[in-house]
Regions:
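Acidic, metal-coordinating catalytic segment for phosphate/diphosphate chemistry
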Residues: 224-225
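Catalytic cores of DNA base-excision repair glycosylases
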Residues: 8-15, 23, 27-214, 218-221
Length: 226
């Protein structure tokens, strides 16, 4: 396990971690945006949303997400879809390799997991086009596993909370933020905890000097708050 002290990061004690979890989740329960993929625990639906949200804005994704699941309501439907229909469903989102990889992953699920979406982080991470972040998101949201989902928003929040002086854009530093999240993640509500941090990063702890610190529910324990 990574020793965070070697990177100049001092973690909170158990009481402060518990308080942080409560405060963040209370805020999320009150303030979270009502998004269609937050109304389900279906791993297939969550997977579709996570892939679509890569490099695409939330409001743009919503109609595509709803149409895609209307056209391909199950993993089997996606695995067997004609390429022309598949690409038509994705038209306008760009980065077509995303949907091609999704179909390959759906075929993996049919062949290797008897058509059942895998329910462990390790097996989810074996699917084509799924990296550590997406595997963590699906594992925690759909299956309640205490697996962090560490994306750019989450790394920015962590960097400010703990005054981490390592570039979040450098892939080799991801392990630092992963180690922080391994400690912080709420074991009882891991999916909501991950989504709460993503929501905080997307709506309050904004990049490029426009963070809304006065609206932040966890400003009291943030080293970056001045």
């Amino acid at each position: 396990m990574l020793d965070l002290k070697e990177y100049g990061i001092v973690m909170w004690d158990a009481e402060k971690i518990a308080s942080f979890r409560r405060t963040l989740l209370d805020w999320y329960d009150r303030e979270k945006r009502d998004l269609p993929w937050r109304r389900t625990r279906n791993p297939y639906y969550i997977w579709v949303s996570e892939i679509m949200l890569q490099q695409t804005q939330v409001q743009t994704v919503i109609p595509y997400y709803e149409r895609f699941l209307d056209w391909f309501p199950t993993v089997k439907d996606l695995a067997e879809a004609p390429e022309e229909k598949l690409l038509k469903a994705w038209e306008g989102l760009g980065y077509y390799s995303r949907v091609r990889n999704m179909q390959k992953a759906a075929q993996q699920i049919m062949d290797d997991f008897d058509g059942q979406f895998p329910d462990t982080y390790e097996n989810i991470a074996k699917l084509k086009g799924i990296g550590p972040y997406t595997a963590g998101a699906i594992s925690s949201i759909a299956f309640g596993l205490p697996e962090p989902a560490v994306d750019g928003n989450v790394m920015r929040v962590m960097a400010r909370l703990f005054e981490v002086n390592y570039d979040i854009g450098d892939a080799k530093n991801r392990k630092i933020f992963q180690a922080i999240m391994d400690i912080l993640i709420d074991p009882n509500r891991p999916g909501d905890f991950n989504q709460a941090l993503m929501e905080l990063g997307a709506t309050v702890c904004l990049p490029n000097g426009v963070a809304l610190c006065e609206q932040c529910p966890v400003q009291g324990c943030c080293k970056g708050y001045r």
